[in-house]
From Swiss-Prot:
Name this polypeptide is given: Proline--tRNA ligase
GO terms of biological process kind: prolyl-tRNA aminoacylation
Species this chain originates from: Rhodococcus erythropolis (strain PR4 / NBRC 100887)
Domain comment as written in the entry: Consists of three domains: the N-terminal catalytic domain, the editing domain and the C-terminal anticodon-binding domain.
Keyword hit for Cytoplasm: yes
């Protein structure tokens, strides 16, 4: 196919859009691939849609290769199935909710586990029908509080979601591994640099969970890896290495001190190092207690105390993952007034437990560890409060930040952090949703058996931005051949009619050879055409210019920047060879 730029619906821009922060957003808008309609909502223009469709093609090919069958469910979903699974509430403000004219509740679907489970229930009733994997490429909706980075984090996005149904846990493991392998092939074909990390399941539920993260400094996800072993995990999924407990024998008794004007860890450490405690005190010797309120879906707010070493900050993503499906908020001045046993800046574990407040601690707070912490009175701290002797937590919680140099959970070395963009996620859901909807089929022995599910997602539209983020330079985009909007970008850089006819002839021959050609036949200067060719990012640029009179054609490699002249008579063979390798 030949696409003539003189006819193509395309307007390139010389300046970056004012709201663009990352390279992919800037370049996709400047190159005329997408246009913003509203915060987090974008239109796909012809070239952008081509790239999007190429990504879809690769995803479909690999899904079909593992036996997936494509269906399409509605994006407008009734409330009842999601009420049954409790996710109507669990998703909170992230859902787009609406009512029809009769007052019935609907939502724009962020995910489809419930509908897939009900679909299988409605069609299959025998063990002979299983295993089965269904998938769709569907528009999803999420009411992001702060849409950013163009199509990387929008309110409307295209996603491939697939669901496996097996009659045994062994079958689920096979389906999970098949999807995992398919995802590796997808991202490799798309030219994406990625890492697979252990993850949490969140509102999806289930057990085993891994994320595919595209390596990127602008990524919103922080992950850690152990260079010695290859262990990698999203920070939400990292399990703290628990130290050995310490015998109580010989530990001094706890003592309360007057510590006026020390409501922060820094001021407390300054006081301690001037109080002649017999050793140098650091923030790691202190135990800070953070107060939040939590609420299970449909439940009431409850106070929760969280104790972590004073040299660590709370990582809200880790806290959120640890508390799910409950939501949390930090307590307010009103909460302090309503609970006078909370001494702001001087909270300790004893008053919390004496007043029935659940108290969870960092896994490092093991029996025998001694802490400087609040004494539950304004201007007072206790020194030498020993876990397991002077206070007994109700459990542990992964809420403290993970830092470079922390011990790897596999014991092989230390952790280093990096950032990435989530492009895929695989879950072993188990029977969470088949239990909700009583999806039972007859087993070979004539008794009912309940299928177990896997859920697998790929961010299709996000991948376009990820590829742009990883494959660009200061001049513009550089699409991998697998997803490029064309195979060849042919520039007519000479006003001579003979050169124009030669370019038209080249384009026609390339078309007959099965190549996709963008032909820049506009009445614009060569400089404008060259800039647009680099901005648009087709991997091979062919220039019919001054050399045409001497029987020469120029070939430019958009990735390497290399340029060479070839004989016009052998240009077709050379171009086809360059495209197809």
């Amino acid at each position: 196919m030949i696409t003539r730029l003189s006819h193509l619906f395309l307007r390139t821009l010389r300046d970056d859009p004012s709201d663009a922060e990352v390279a992919s957003h800037k370049l996709l808008v400047r190159a005329g691939y997408v246009r913003r309609i509203a915060p987090g909502v974008y239109s796909w223009l012809p070239l952008g849609l081509r790239v999007l469709r190429e990504v879809e093609r690769v995803v479909r090919e690999e899904m079909n290769a593992i036996g997936g069958q494509e269906i399409l469910l509605p994006a407008l979903l009734p409330r009842d199935p999601y009420e049954a699974s409790n996710r109507w509430t669990e998703y909170g403000p992230n859902l787009f909710r609406l009512k029809d004219r009769k007052g019935n509740d609907y939502m724009l679907g962020p995910t489809h586990e419930e509908l897939f489970a009900l679909t299988v229930k409605g069609e299959y009733n025998s063990y002979k029908d299983f295993p089965v994997t269904l998938y769709q490429v569907q528009t999803k909706y999420r009411d992001e509080e702060r849409p950013r980075a163009g199509i990387l984090r929008g309110r409307e996005f295209l996603m491939k979601d697939s669901y496996s149904f097996d009659l045994s846990d062994e079958g689920l493991t096979e389906s999970y591994q098949a999807h995992r392998g398919a995802y590796e092939k997808i991202f490799t074909r798309l030219g994406v640099k990625y890492v697979i990390v252990s993850a949490t399941s969140g509102a999806m539920g289930g057990s085993a969970s891994e994320e595919f993260l595209a390596e990127s400094e602008i990524g919103e996800d922080t992950y850690v890896r152990c260079l010695e072993s290859g262990y990698a995990a999203n920070v939400e999924a990292v399990k703290t290495v628990v130290p050995d407990s310490i015998p109580f024998d010989g530990l001094p008794e706890a003592k309360v001190y007057d510590t006026a004007n020390t409501p922060t860890i820094d001021t407390l450490v300054d006081w301690a190092n001037g109080a002649d405690l017999g050793r140098t005190i650091t923030a790691a010797d202190t135990l800070k207690n953070i107060m939040v309120k939590t609420r299970l879906p449909g439940g009431e707010w409850e106070l929760l105390g969280i104790g972590i070493p004073g040299d660590r900050e709370v990582d809200e993503k880790r806290l959120e993952a640890s508390l799910e499906p409950a939501e949390f908020v930090m307590i307010t001045e009103t909460d302090f007034k309503n609970n006078p046993f909370l001494a702001k800046g001087y909270i300790g574990p004893k008053a919390l437990q004496a007043n029935g407040v659940r108290y969870l601690v960092d896994p490092r707070v093991v029996d025998g560890t001694s802490w400087i912490t609040g004494a539950d009175e304004d201007g007072k701290h206790v020194v030498g409060l020993v876990a397991g002797r002077d206070f007994t937590p109700d459990g542990t919680i992964e809420a403290a930040e993970v830092r470079d140099g922390d011990a790897s959970p596999d014991g092989a070395g230390t952790l280093v952090s990096a950032r990435g963009i989530e492009i895929g996620h695989v879950f072993q859901l188990g029977r969470k949703y088949t239990d909700v909807f009583t999806v039972d089929v007859l087993a070979e022995n004539g008794k009912p058996v309940r299928p177990t599910m896997g859920s697998y997602g790929v961010g299709v539209s996000r991948l376009v931005a990820v590829i742009a983020e990883q494959h660009h330079d200061e001049k513009g985009l550089r699409w991998p051949a697998e997803v490029s909007p064309a195979d060849v970008y042919l520039v007519i850089a000479n006003k001579d009619e003979t050169a124009r006819e030669g370019a038209e002839g080249l384009a026609a021959q390339l078309d007959r050879a099965g190549l996709e050609v963008i032909l820049d036949d506009r009445k614009a200067s060569p400089g404008v055409k060259f800039k647009d060719s680099e901005l648009i990012g087709v991997p091979l640029i062919v220039v019919v210019g001054r050399g045409w009179a001497d029987g020469k054609v120029e070939i430019r490699d958009r990735f390497t920047g290399e340029s060479r002249e070839i004989d016009a008579d052998s240009a077709i063979e050379a171009i086809i060879s360059a495209v197809r390798g």
